[in-house]
UniProtKB/Swiss-Prot annotation:
Keywords: Cell shape, Cell wall biogenesis/degradation, Isomerase, Peptidoglycan synthesis. It comes from the Bacteria. HAMAP family: Glu_racemase. This is Glutamate racemase. It comes from Geobacter metallireducens (strain ATCC 53774 / DSM 7210 / GS-15). GO terms for biological process: cell wall organization; peptidoglycan biosynthetic process; regulation of cell shape. Belongs to the aspartate/glutamate racemases family.
Length: 270
């Protein structure tokens, strides 16, 4: 079991920021990443559809003999995590709970901000998770949809990025939050401009970092860490042509992706 890979999936490239943190925390581990590029974005789909997609991808990854599954997608974490945990016999980790736990732990004023896509904010998934941990925390949310194309275009520190950040984050500054959750896997690429805009006194919680920390804890606690000092191998699969995934993915991962293979989930089921 320890020699098996970690499976990770997202609707596209955003989950590569989670993979990047997992590689940083657990460099010896093998990983298998699936980006559902044929059906991105998930935020516009119904919860039932997102759950069906997630179960299909989980089946694909489980057949490749993984030891743990990371749902590196906020929408899928909000809609499908429970179904995945009930269906699979391996640990399943989403990105919402780790970020929520960290935010509830570090806030001093009891006022936490959450930014994310329109779908994630509309689901109230982070607010509900934070409230479950500490009902006294006040959660202020803001959808920041333009951050996604900015991250994918690499416009992460120019005037457009700064203007967009000021527009989105001014209300959170006025609300007096002392902690801000980056509730989208694209947003770590904009961490610098977000931090400068919201102010250094506000603690940024990166859900990708927190998810990697939880994954490490689970593997260590279950004696599932790969017992070697050698660097792990990383494999990439997508459901549509990989050219765009590779172009943007190199930036998200902070290095060059290896080979990326296009697969048909329908064919896999046959």
């Amino acid at each position: 079991m320890p020699w098996k890979a970690i499976g990770i999936f997202d609707s596209g490239v955003g989950g590569l920021t989670v993979l990047k943190e997992i590689i940083k925390a657990l460099p010896q581990e093998d990983t298998i990443y699936f980006g559902d590029t044929a059906r991105v974005p998930y935020g516009t789909k119904s919860p039932e559809t997102v759950t069906r997609y997630s179960l299909e991808i989980a089946s694909f990854l489980v057949h490749r003999d993984i030891k743990l599954l990371v749902v590196a997608c906020n929408t899928a974490s909000a809609c499908a995590l429970e179904a995945l945990q009930q269906t699979l016999s391996i640990p399943v980790v989403g990105v919402i709970e780790p970020g929520a736990r960290r935010a509830a732990a570090v806030t001093r004023s009891g006022r936490v901000g959450v930014i994310g896509t329109e779908g994630t904010i509309r689901s109230s998934a982070y607010a509900k998770a934070i409230k479950r941990i500490n009902p006294e925390v006040e959660v202020v949310t803001r959808a920041c949809p333009l951050f996604v194309p900015l991250a994918e275009e690499g416009w992460t520190d120019n005037e457009v990025a700064h203007l967009t950040a000021r527009t989105y984050l001014s209300g959170l500054r006025e609300a007096g939050v002392d902690t801000l959750v980056l509730g989208c896997t694209h947003y770590p690429l904009l961490k610098r401009v977000i931090g400068e805009t919201i102010g250094e006194e506000v603690k940024l919680v990166d859900s990708a970092e927190e998810t990697a920390r939880i994954v490490a804890e689970i593997l260590r606690g279950g004696e599932l860490l790969r017992p070697t000092s050698e660097q792990g191998n990383h494999h990439y699969f997508v459901s549509d042509v990989p050219a765009g995934f590779i172009r943007v993915g190199n930036r998200f991962l902070g290095g060059k992706l290896g080979d990326v293979y296009q697969v048909s989930l329908e064919a896999e089921k046959e």
